[in-house]
């Protein structure tokens, strides 16, 4: 199993090219099941979860071809299997997103209950309840979701009990081929949901209101393939910006979208960073300045993203002052705190809040990645810690960050992938 070996690196400097968004690419790839003709997707990151999604589509009989560094072509002409098996689904929670497309186009789907990061329950009931309102018959049996519909799904007025990105995406895809109008209230507003909606519209879907809390979908008879480019990864962007702030550096993120990161950029400015943006780039300058402590509360978009919480734990660990970070989206999402404490961070947990007292320096240590974003926080900590940091179990990192060690090296970071 690979590890990352990280040495204190000084101030990061230079340009980093941001990859396509994993959390947009995964549902967009699943949407390929809805298309009757070839579907071409570009700016697809080369990640473990993306590879798992492609393998899942192949398992169903679709032809999936990767070309260049970022292109995927999907053909469903020979799709003839409707079961997403445990062996694939167990490694990636987003596999549940195949449920809506299979059911909408083929009327049948068997999907193993999903896996992914162990950061809380994240139940699938909202997905199932919405599909049942659209006429699906669903039972959960022997670890599988077994869904059937006679004829086409029917449009429905769905009010979601809580905001769920995955459920919004699943219902959006299912409703695109349903009979009649579907209204989703209390829908997730994340940019990745909007990106999926824009992709579906390019395929011929009729969708209004994506990016608001009420989305209207008028079902159509069929969807066709198209050429679509995945949005930039806002969480990767934010992670590099935090790394630059923590190391007191100056970097520019290109192929980025500042409009999707307003809450994160505001907190970085509160921490003392100078931020400059263009249409597709963000520059952060923290040269010669120690970050100031910033209080964080994670909330659904457009609020502060839960996927940036761990990175700001590191920033606050080295900041001037004391800060609190409150996690409201997922339970059990402070698993990085004990690992950062091993590096000398002064942190204490009180329920869903972490109280962080900033100190001058961290010390290198052997630490263990517990989930995707926690692993990114440990890498950032290693860049600024005195001595050597070894991050174990970086397969979590490979699920969501493309060539992270190479990108940090390009900014002057001393990061090396080593075999166990």
UniProtKB/Swiss-Prot annotation:
The active site is at residue 117. It is an enzyme of class 2 (transferase). Disulfide bonds: none annotated. It comes from the Bacteria. UDP-N-acetyl-alpha-D-glucosamine binds at residues 93, 307, 329. It catalyses: phosphoenolpyruvate + UDP-N-acetyl-alpha-D-glucosamine = UDP-N-acetyl-3-O-(1-carboxyvinyl)-alpha-D-glucosamine + phosphate. GO terms for cellular component: cytoplasm. It holds the Pfam family EPSP_synthase. One of its GO terms (biological process) is UDP-N-acetylgalactosamine biosynthetic process. InterPro entries: Enolpyruvate_Tfrase_dom, Enolpyruvate_Tfrase_sf, MurA_subfamily, RNA3'P_cycl/enolpyr_Trfase_a/b, UDP_GlcNAc_COvinyl_MurA. Pathway: Cell wall biogenesis; peptidoglycan biosynthesis. The keyword Isomerase does not apply. Phosphoenolpyruvate binds at residues 22-23. It is found in: Cytoplasm. Cell wall formation. Adds enolpyruvyl to UDP-N-acetylglucosamine. PANTHER family: UDP-N-ACETYLGLUCOSAMINE 1-CARBOXYVINYLTRANSFERASE. HAMAP family: MurA (MF_00111). This is UDP-N-acetylglucosamine 1-carboxyvinyltransferase. It comes from Shewanella halifaxensis (strain HAW-EB4).
């Amino acid at each position: 199993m690979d590890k990352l070996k990280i040495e204190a690196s000084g101030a990061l400097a230079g340009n980093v090219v941001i990859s396509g968004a994993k959390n947009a690419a995964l549902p967009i790839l699943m949407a390929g099941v809805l298309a009757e003709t070839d579907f071409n997707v570009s700016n697809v990151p080369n990640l473990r979860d993306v590879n798992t999604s492609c393998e899942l589509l192949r398992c169903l009989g679709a032809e999936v071809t990767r070309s260049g560094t970022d292109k995927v072509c999907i053909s469903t002409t020979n799709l003839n299997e409707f079961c997403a098996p445990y062996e694939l689904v167990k490694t990636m929670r987003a596999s549940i997103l195949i449920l809506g497309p299979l059911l909408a186009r083929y009327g049948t789907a068997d999907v193993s209950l999903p896996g992914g990061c162990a950061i809380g329950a994240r139940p699938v009931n909202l997905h199932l309840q919405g599909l049942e309102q659209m006429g699906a018959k669903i039972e959960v049996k022997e670890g599988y979701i077994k869904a059937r519909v006679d004829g086409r799904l029917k449009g429905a007025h769905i009010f979601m009990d809580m905001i769920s990105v995955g459920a919004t995406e699943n219902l959006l895809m299912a409703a695109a081929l349903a009979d009649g109008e579907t209204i989703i209230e209390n829908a997730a507003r994340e940019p990745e949901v909007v990106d999926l909606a824009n992709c579906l519209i390019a395929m011929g879907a009729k969708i209004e209101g994506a990016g608001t809390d009420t989305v209207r979908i008028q079902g159509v008879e069929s969807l066709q393939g198209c050429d679509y480019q995945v949005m930039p990864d806002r969480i990767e962007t934010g992670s590099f910006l935090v790394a630059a702030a923590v190391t007191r550096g100056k970097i520019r993120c290109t192929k980025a979208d500042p409009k999707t990161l307003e809450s994160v950029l505001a907190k970085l400015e509160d921490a003392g960073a100078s931020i400059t943006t263009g249409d597709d780039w963000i520059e952060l300058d923290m040269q010669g300045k120690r970050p100031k402590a910033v209080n964080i509360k994670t909330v659904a978009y457009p609020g502060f993203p839960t996927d940036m919480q761990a990175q700001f734990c590191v920033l606050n660990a080295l900041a001037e002052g004391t800060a609190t970070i409150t996690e409201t989206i997922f339970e059990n999402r402070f698993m990085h705190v004990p690992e950062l404490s091993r590096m000398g961070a002064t942190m204490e947990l009180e329920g869903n809040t972490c109280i962080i007292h900033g100190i001058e320096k961290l010390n290198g240590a052997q630490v263990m990645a517990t989930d995707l974003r926690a692993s990114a926080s440990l890498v950032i900590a290693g860049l600024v810690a005195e001595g050597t940091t070894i991050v174990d179990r970086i397969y979590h990192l490979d699920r969501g960050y493309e060539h992270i060690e190479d990108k940090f090296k390009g900014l002057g970071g001393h990061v090396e992938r080593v075999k166990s």
